[in-house]
From Swiss-Prot:
Record-given protein name: Crossover junction endodeoxyribonuclease RuvC
Catalysis performed (reactions): Endonucleolytic cleavage at a junction such as a reciprocal single-stranded crossover between two homologous DNA duplexes (Holliday junction)
Organism taxonomic ancestry: Bacteria, Bacillati, Bacillota, Bacilli, Bacillales
Subunit structure, as described in the record: Homodimer which binds Holliday junction (HJ) DNA. The HJ becomes 2-fold symmetrical on binding to RuvC with unstacked arms; it has a different conformation from HJ DNA in complex with RuvA. In the full resolvosome a probable DNA-RuvA(4)-RuvB(12)-RuvC(2) complex forms which resolves the HJ.
UniProt-listed NCBIfam families: PRK00039.2-1, ruvC
PROSITE patterns, alphabetized: RUVC
Location of this chain's protein in the cell: Cytoplasm
Endpoints of the signal sequence: none
CDD domains hit by this protein: RuvC
Transmembrane segments: none
EC number from the UniProt entry: 3.1.21.10
Swiss-Prot/TrEMBL keywords: Cytoplasm, DNA damage, DNA recombination, DNA repair, DNA-binding, Endonuclease, Hydrolase, Magnesium, Metal-binding, Nuclease
Pfam families: RuvC
Length: 166
């Protein structure tokens, strides 16, 4: 199964493509989509949408996992990131790729085994689990890989619950 993990943002969208074969995880590609700060938000959203369409076409993931929004301070930032998240999810929907969402706590739990893990711990475990030489930069990229790992870990439970619903 191929998973596209996404850490949404307006300035930087981290992405990580991971293949899961049995219990093995293999990184395929990872990086970021970056938009220029001075550009109007609609143009930045268009750039993110088009880049997402390209990623989805190039890597053809079976499923996509996205981090749920969690902001407790800056409401303006939350709205803008929410807009970016919307075009990201729309691109996946148009490509016929199912989207799964995870909270930051779920990511911490899946990657490190501890829901209160620090960012550095998550990044180091991501590096270890994917057998990378170093932690990917910027942080958004490492976060996206962590989100893909989270979906790989939760996938077995999703399959069981989907079977129950049928």
């Amino acid at each position: 199964m191929r998973i596209l993990g996404i850490d949404p943002g307006i300035a930087i969208v981290g992405f990580g493509v991971v293949d899961k074969e049995g219990s093995q995880l293999r990184p395929v590609q990872y990086g970021s989509i970056q938009t220029e700060a001075g550009l109007p938000v609609p143009l930045r959203l268009k750039q993110i949408f088009e880049a997402m369409q390209s990623l989805l076409e190039t890597y053809r993931p079976d499923e996509m996992s996205v981090e749920k929004l969690f902001f407790n301070k800056n409401v303006t930032t939350a709205f803008t990131v929410g807009q970016a998240r919307g075009v990201i999810i729309l691109a996946a929907e148009l490509a016929g790729v199912p989207v799964y969402e995870y909270t930051p706590m779920q990511v911490k739990q899946a990657v490190t085994g501890y829901g209160g893990a620090e960012k550095k711990q998550i990044q180091e475990m991501t590096k270890l689990l994917l057998r990378l030489k170093e932690v990917p930069k910027p942080d958004d990229v490492a976060d996206a890989l962590g989100i893909a790992i989270t979906h790989a870990q939760f996938r077995a439970f999703i399959s069981i619950s989907e079977g129950v619903k049928k």
